[in-house]
């Protein structure tokens, strides 16, 4: 229901597949990044810049982004808000056609 979320440099992810958006500085997340790389599930969307966020998906893919986690999260919530507004407009249009 979230649609596509921009993670920087024109790269987008499917919002419904996201489990977490986290800061990459902790040791466990650095290990997670290495494991994902070994398993072929690491996607680097940083374009050579510093990794500022790690996005974890329900398929165990780990996506690196140069965008701050807070920024990605706000885009995530904005997408959700936009979808809710669109659904409400559709519901109102359906009510008008029923009358």
Curated annotation (Swiss-Prot):
Pfam families: RemA-like. InterPro entries: RemA-like (IPR007169). Belongs to the RemA family. PANTHER family: REGULATORY PROTEIN SSL2874-RELATED, REGULATORY PROTEIN TM_1690-RELATED. This is Putative regulatory protein Kole_1849. The lineage of its organism: Bacteria, Thermotogati, Thermotogota, Thermotogae, Kosmotogales.
């Amino acid at each position: 229901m979230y649609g596509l979320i921009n993670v920087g440099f024109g790269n987008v992810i499917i919002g419904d597949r996201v489990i977490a958006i986290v800061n990459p500085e902790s040791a466990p997340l650095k290990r997670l990044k290495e494991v994902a790389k070994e398993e072929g599930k690491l996607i680097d969307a940083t374009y050579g810049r510093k990794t500022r966020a790690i996005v974890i998906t329900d398929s165990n893919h780990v996506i690196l982004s140069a965008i701050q986690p807070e920024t990605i999260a706000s885009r995530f919530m904005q997408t959700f808000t936009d979808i809710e507004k669109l659904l409400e407009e559709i519901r109102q249009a359906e009510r008008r056609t029923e009358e």
